[in-house]
Amino acid sequence: MKFIVSSSALLKQLQQISGVINANTVLPILEDFLFEIEKNKLTVVATDLETVMKVHLDIEAKDSGKVCIPAKILLDSLKNIPEQPLTFNVDKNFAVEITSDNGKYKVMGETPDNFPKEPAADDANSFTMTSSALVTAINKAIFAVSNDDLRPAMTGVFFELDKKGITFVATDAHRLVRYTRSDVSCPKKDNFIVPKKPLNLLKGSLPDNDDELKVSYNSNHLFVVHGGTELVCRLIDARFPDYKVVIPADNPYKMVVNKHDFQNALRRVSVFSNKSTNQVALSISGSVLQLAAQDVDFSFEGNERMTCQYDGEDLQIAFNAKFLIEMLNGADTADIVMELSTPTKAGLIKPSEQGEGEQLLMLVMPLMLNN
């Protein structure tokens, strides 16, 4: 089997799917790319048994066939080869010889028979959405996903489908993000949980533009197709917690503050906080917001004050500054709105204006105030 392919085009596509491959895998075949050649088309597949990514390239080829090629050595070599046509020759024992303008490189491939088969999209429901809508949703929600494997339902993003739109929810029990798109229409009410890893892979490979994606799902898998790139992942088989019950219906106190100034003040003051809690206390009175942090063990203390617009009774409430800083990144407006209640009730964070066709709400649990 022989084919000719552009070195830079091949490298670009391989880098797009190489994130699927785990460094420490149990099965050696999972360290390989599967190359499939048919009618001047090359399909390259990578999998970790949970997620499959596939890309398609145009090549010059007279025959068809398959071979598994070790991913790391192929990527390392392509990174150092300038743009030029490369000729791949594969013999009957799956030995691969790569010929460039000035060199010849050999690597031992493997039989494709041992490469895992990808899941089929049987009984799948489908809908379309723009690439930017999915990328934005992933960016808004993924930071709140839990890393606690003992609670598998929280280790992914919950997709709640409706004819009126999609709601994306993520929580780690300390904070929660709910992001709704009303510019996407789904065929029926449904829901599923997508793991963090494939979402990060989609975020890295999809363009932030209005390209159309085809999204399909069945009871076990999610399928996303964009142009010549395909991703299939196993869904999390667990029940997502009833997130609606934890969102306060009425937080009477409202504070509007400049996002950039608030983030920077949190960064400065949190340097002096206890490193295990990152606790920063907010004292709000009139148009003054006071931030305070301390680490009693080391006699560290930091205080700052800034202006805000506040409608409510004087309040002192503490939060994890690291969480607040991360959550504020999700708001795309110059100002953010915090809706608060008592020092023991969850606070809500929203952008001062919602984008067209989208609604973002973030919830953060308070910490017990240090005396």
Give the positions of each predicted feature.
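Structural preference for solvent-exposed beta-strand-turn elements
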Residues: M1-N371
